């Protein structure tokens, strides 16, 4: 059984060493380009031509990143992720990439509040090969120990075998384990505490991706999760301890591969390239494979191949659908539209394959527009209602206090006023601020199996279209800005989405975001603008963990 310990997370991704991320890119120009005024990308191309040329690091729309003498790009990802790759490369939460192959045991990540969980790696030298490879990952949570032996058919052992995994899902203490199928793979989903979950790939690769609710509460080789990329290898004790041994060269094995090894790996990986949905990774994995082949021969190269094939089969990022304002939708695949209508029980998102869950939204009339009245989340026979009036939370029709935990459902407050409802093994997360910000997250098991306003999660926005499931007749959107309103709306909204927001919140579709902001101002005046600014502040925090100041007009 191939194992992945999955994460339910949100986030922000920045490439730190661009030449490492794009090793086969042409040499950068000798002169430093002018810093572009816009970092937006459209259909894989940087809108501003000064934004570099590393097209394979952009998947459709997103952002391009430019640093002096470097040519890289970044995507609009919603995942804070740390990775250990089969070739011995590590990537921290903020994208610092390094190679580390020293035998021993190392803390990849741990909780710093109470020390109630940790993820430890065991690196070993096998059969006299060069360097070391990942052989075991150990997860300790509140007294329970889960050992995952890498590159084996039956890898999981709970508490030394004293607690066999006999059910699906299987729960022990704070940990839930469930096997979910995706095309070509069985995935084991393990979640604990506030959405700290790990992906253990079937070869010798690990990914850990915590929810932003854990900001400032994690340390280890992955980094301290302080939401500050400048902290990498400057403050964390686990990072500093390994620093003398990172990026060590091995005789005859350059990091970018020997030419003959590169050709071998191209032949090994090429048959899988045509069916890879994330083919931007091909060159990166080819060079990683070549390095691994030089270090440990065919066996180690095959683990890189397995890493590549699994990455190809999974979506590039976590599926995120957002409802914001009055009422704007961004689907899982980033189609965007707005509608007004006092619709009851509108299907926002659902598992339309196994019918295990759905998320529905009720709207109500408010003068000339509509807003959210209630969000209903169903998992099998369990129904959770989030009611705006009074911030009521009901499970099975009964009021519950927060935090709440029962079977595979947990509900808790994040950042004071964002309610998070997490459901496993479906890997469904719903975040709602009881106003006009609703975020739905799903993961790999539902790739191509969802329906509703959020669309079919398949990385194809062309098959996402507005469909209210016949629940109501749509009413026209209120008119936009008058000529008198427009100048002030433009001033406020351009200031809200200034250039600093690009880096802090990885803002995609900036012109569209400004238009939405202006719509809110022209709909409800200064109050509409300030409500929108606060919603954006929360959206930025949910997706990327960054905390923004609201405009002075709203303080």
Curated annotation (Swiss-Prot):
Which Gene Ontology terms cover its molecular function?
carboxy-lyase activity; Cypridina-luciferin 2-monooxygenase activity
**Signal peptide range in chain numbering:** 1-11
- Known catalytic reactions: Cypridina luciferin + O2 = oxidized Cypridina luciferin + hnu + CO2
Provide the disulphide bond pattern. Answer: 82-222, 321-454, 343-493, 352-451
Oxidoreductase: is it a keyword of this entry? yes
- Annotated glycan sites: 186, 408
- Biological process according to GO: bioluminescence
Q: Which GO terms describe its cellular component?
A: extracellular matrix; extracellular space
**Posttranslational mods:** The cysteine residues presumably exist in intramolecular disulfide bridges.
The keyword Oxidoreductase is assigned to this record: yes
Instruction: Give its E.C. classification number.
Output: 1.13.12.6
| PROSITE patterns, per database record | VWFD
Q: Please give the InterPro entries that the UniProt record associates with this protein.
A: Mucin_vWF_Thrombospondin_sf (IPR050780), VWF_type-D (IPR001846)
Q: Which UniProt keywords apply?
A: Decarboxylase, Disulfide bond, Glycoprotein, Luminescence, Lyase, Monooxygenase, Oxidoreductase, Photoprotein, Repeat, Signal
| Residue ranges constituting the VWFD domain according to the UniProt record | 80-266, 319-494
Q: What else is known?
A: 60 kcal/mol are required for the blue emission of light (460 nm) due to the oxidation of luciferin via a dioxetanone intermediate, in which the excited state oxyluciferin bound to luciferase is the emitter.
Query: Can you say what this protein is called?
Result: Luciferin 2-monooxygenase
């Amino acid at each position: 059984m191939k194992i992945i310990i999955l994460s339910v997370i949100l986030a922000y991704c920045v490439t730190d060493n661009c030449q490492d991320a794009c090793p086969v890119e042409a040499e950068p120009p000798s002169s430093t380009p002018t810093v572009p005024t816009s970092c937006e990308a459209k259909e894989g191309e940087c809108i501003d031509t000064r934004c570099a040329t590393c097209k394979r690091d952009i998947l459709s729309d997103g952002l391009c990143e430019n640093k002096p003498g470097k040519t890289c790009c970044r995507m609009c990802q919603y995942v804070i992720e740390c990775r250990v790759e089969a070739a011995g490369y590590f990537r921290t939460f903020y994208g610092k990439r390094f190679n580390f192959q020293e035998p021993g045991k190392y803390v990849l990540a741990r909780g710093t509040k109470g020390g109630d969980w940790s993820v430890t790696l065991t690196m070993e030298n096998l059969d006299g090969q060069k360097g070391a490879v990942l052989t075991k990952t150990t997860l300790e949570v509140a007294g329970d120990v889960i050992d995952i032996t890498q590159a084996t058919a039956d890898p999981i052992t709970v508490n030394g075998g004293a607690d066999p995994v006999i059910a699906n899902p299987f729960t022990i203490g704070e940990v839930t384990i469930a096997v979910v199928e995706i095309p070509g793979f069985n995935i084991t989903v393990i979640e604990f505490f506030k959405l700290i979950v790990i992906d253990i790939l079937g070869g010798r690769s690990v990914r850990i991706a915590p929810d932003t609710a854990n900001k400032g509460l994690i340390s280890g080789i992955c980094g301290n999760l302080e939401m500050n990329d400048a902290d990498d290898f400057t403050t964390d004790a686990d990072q500093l301890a390994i620093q003398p041994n990172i990026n060590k060269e091995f005789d005859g094995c350059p990091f970018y591969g020997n030419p003959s090894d590169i050709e071998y790996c191209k032949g090994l990986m090429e048959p899988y390239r045509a069916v890879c949905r994330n083919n931007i990774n091909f060159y990166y994995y080819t060079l990683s494979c070549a390095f691994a082949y030089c270090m440990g021969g065919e066996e180690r190269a095959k683990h890189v191949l397995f890493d590549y094939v699994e990455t190809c089969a999974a979506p590039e990022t976590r599926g995120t659908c957002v409802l914001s304002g009055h009422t704007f939708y961004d689907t899982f695949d980033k189609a965007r539209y707005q509608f007004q209508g006092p619709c009851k029980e509108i299907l926002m998102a659902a598992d339309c394959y196994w019918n295990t869950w759905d998320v529905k939204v009720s709207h109500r009339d408010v003068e000339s527009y509509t807003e959210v009245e209630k969000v209903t989340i169903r998992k099998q026979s369990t129904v959770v209602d989030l009611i705006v009036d009074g911030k009521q939370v009901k499970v099975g029709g009964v009021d519950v206090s927060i935090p709440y935990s029962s079977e595979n459902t947990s509900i808790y407050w994040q950042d004071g006023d964002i309610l998070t409802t997490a459901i496993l093994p479906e890997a469904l997360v719903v975040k709602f601020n009881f106003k006009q910000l609703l975020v739905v997250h799903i993961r790999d098991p539902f790739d191509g199996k969802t329906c509703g306003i959020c669309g079919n999660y398949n990385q194809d926005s062309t098959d996402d279209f507005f469909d209210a499931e016949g629940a109501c007749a749509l009413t026209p959107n209120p008119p936009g800005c008058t000529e008198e309103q427009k100048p002030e709306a433009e001033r406020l909204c351009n200031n809200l989405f200034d250039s600093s927001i690009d880096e802090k919140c990885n803002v995609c579709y900036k012109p569209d975001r400004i238009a939405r902001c202006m719509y809110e101002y022209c709909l409800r005046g200064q109050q509409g603008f300030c409500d929108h600014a606060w919603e954006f502040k929360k959206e930025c925090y949910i997706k990327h963990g960054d905390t923004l100041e609201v405009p002075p007009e709203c303080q």
